[in-house]
């Protein structure tokens, strides 16, 4: 496996670091059958890719074998965001038959963390992700990795995330504080649920910690909704 260097130049405060650790704990308690986890949002720029990278890196640092898979075949940002200097191949090239699996995966400079990049943007990402080759790839990856985090395009305007969700064990929603209405978030969650994917929870991102009253109200409302989700899942069992 080829090795690449990813530079994390983001500034993270104490609250962010602690939130990622809490998210890691919640993922660990999701169950041993939860390996492939989709991470998405309602709209672009809510911070889902930052959360995906931070969570993958945190869990990898605990000794777990982790793969971060960028399935945003429309507008990927990982190569530029993390200053990857090497020329890399990606998922779009693999799914279109241009490269084999041996040229798809990269070991990063972060211990236990491997990466699959999205590759060049393509005109038919929905069709590529919906084909059997993607499911076959995930099946093989499950045999080696403890966790596979799959970063997809936002749910709000594209169907890609729902297609990928069909092949995942769980999903995490990233919601930007004060940017997404409860109605929009609920509609996005429902769309993923219809694919048969279990909702593991949500992340309220970009919170202004000085606005305690707003944060508490917003958090409580989303917490109530996810409690309903958990209760529905328990009823099914």
Residue ranges of predicted features:
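A short, charged, Gly/Pro-tolerant segment at domain boundaries
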Residues: 38-45, 205, 236
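Conserved catalytic-core segment of NTP-binding enzymes
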Residues: 118, 126-224
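P-loop/Walker-type NTP enzyme "switch/lid" segment
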Residues: 2-17, 21, 25-32, 41-46, ...
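Residues that mark the start of a beta-strand
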Residues: 36-38, 63-67
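C-terminal lobe/tail of nucleotide-utilizing enzymes
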Residues: 1-26, 33, 183-237
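Conserved sugar-transfer catalytic core signal across GT-A, GT-B, and GT-C glycosyltransferases
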Residues: 51, 55, 160-161
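Alpha-helix N-cap/loop-to-helix initiation residues
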Residues: 16, 45-48, 157, 181-182
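Short, well-ordered alpha-helices that flank and scaffold nucleotide-derived cofactor binding pockets
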Residues: 25, 57, 61, 166, ...
């Amino acid at each position: 496996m080829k090795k690449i260097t990813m530079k994390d130049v983001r500034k993270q405060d104490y609250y962010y670091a602690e939130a990622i650790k809490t998210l890691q704990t919640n993922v660990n308690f999701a169950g041993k059958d939860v390996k492939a986890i989709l991470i998405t949002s309602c709209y672009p720029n809510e911070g889902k890719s930052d959360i995906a990278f931070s969570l993958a890196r945190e869990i990898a640092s605990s000794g777990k074998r982790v793969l971060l898979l960028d399935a945003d075949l429309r507008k990927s940002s990982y190569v530029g965001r993390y200053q990857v200097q090497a020329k890399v191949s990606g998922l779009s090239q693999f799914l279109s038959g241009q490269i084999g699996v041996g040229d798809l995966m990269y070991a990063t400079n972060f211990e236990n963390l491997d990466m699959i990049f999205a590759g060049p943007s393509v005109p038919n990402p929905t069709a590529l992700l919906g084909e059997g080759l993607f499911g076959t790839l995930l099946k093989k990856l499950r045999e080696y990795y403890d966790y596979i985090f799959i970063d997809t395009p936002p749910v709000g305007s594209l169907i890609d995330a729902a297609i990928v969700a069909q092949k995942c064990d769980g999903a995490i929603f990233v919601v930007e504080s004060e940017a997404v209405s409860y109605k929009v978030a609920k509609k996005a969650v429902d769309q993923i649920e219809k694919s048969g994917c279990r909702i593991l929870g949500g992340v309220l991102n970009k919170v202004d910690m000085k606005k305690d009253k707003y944060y508490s109200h917003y958090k409580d409302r989303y917490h109530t909704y996810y409690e309903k989700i958990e209760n529905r899942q328990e009823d099914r069992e």
